[in-house]
Amino acid sequence: MSPDLDTPLIIALDYPRLDQALAMAERLDPSRCRVKVGKELFTRTGPRVLEALHGLGFEVFLDLKFHDIPNTVAGAVEAAADHGVWMVNVHAGGGRRMMEAARERLERRRLGTHLIAVTVLTSMERDDLIEVGVEAEPLSQVERLARLAQQSGMAGVVCSAQEAAALRATCGDDFLKVTPGIRPRASSADDQRRTLTPGEAMAAGSTHLVVGRPVTQAPDPMAALATIERELAEPS
């Protein structure tokens, strides 16, 4: 993992097949973005996709959102780190003991993978939380889980852009805030509800931005990425 890659952009390779993911990755520049591998792609391809992306020079965020008993999650996180991924995540809802077990496993092995936690999925709104027995407002639940994640030694959390400012106040600037659902100006909201533009998200406090279809479905993905880079460079 390169300590010198200076970009907040993570491109989501949301494809069902290895050849599709690699075809897109080959159109991207690993010096200007990282890539994210999610559940469907990893379940269909296994570690081959990580090996191939690393071979192309990319740092990889393995977005599998582990949530299980502490020892099982610790083993899964260790396995991900052994594959050389830059970042991996767990569900903060799994609790303090689960998160601490995962962190301690990485520390014991001296593995440098960033371990972050998922708070509230960006597709979930107030009514969705009530249906699963959470009476708190989404922001209150995010703050509660982010504090727990930080106390448990996580490097950061996944959070929506609207929540980033509150989490910067709650957890500080050094606590990573990885924000999916990012849409450049004039993009549709697709299926993630709590969305802001890249510039708005970074101004709010996000440290990393996950972008999918606005780049991967563009006729020229690097031109689309360059548009986002220009937007980020504009004065806020």
Swiss-Prot record:
Its EC number is 4.1.1.23. Pfam families: OMPdecase. It comes from the Bacteria. The active site is at K65. Pathway: Pyrimidine metabolism; UMP biosynthesis via de novo pathway; UMP from orotate: step 2/2. InterPro entries: Aldolase_TIM (IPR013785), OMPdecase (IPR014732), OMPdecase_AS (IPR018089), OMPdecase_bac (IPR047596), OMPdeCOase_dom (IPR001754), RibuloseP-bd_barrel (IPR011060). Keywords: Decarboxylase, Lyase, Pyrimidine biosynthesis. One of its GO terms (cellular component) is cytosol. GO terms for biological process: 'de novo' pyrimidine nucleobase biosynthetic process; 'de novo' UMP biosynthetic process. It catalyses: orotidine 5'-phosphate + H(+) = UMP + CO2. GO terms for molecular function: orotidine-5'-phosphate decarboxylase activity. Substrate binds at residues 14, 36, 63-72, 122, 183, 192, 212-213. Catalyzes the decarboxylation of orotidine 5'-monophosphate (OMP) to uridine 5'-monophosphate (UMP). PANTHER family: OROTIDINE 5'-PHOSPHATE DECARBOXYLASE (PTHR32119:SF2). Homodimer. Belongs to the OMP decarboxylase family. Type 1 subfamily. This is Orotidine 5'-phosphate decarboxylase. It comes from Chromohalobacter salexigens (strain ATCC BAA-138 / DSM 3043 / CIP 106854 / NCIMB 13768 / 1H11).
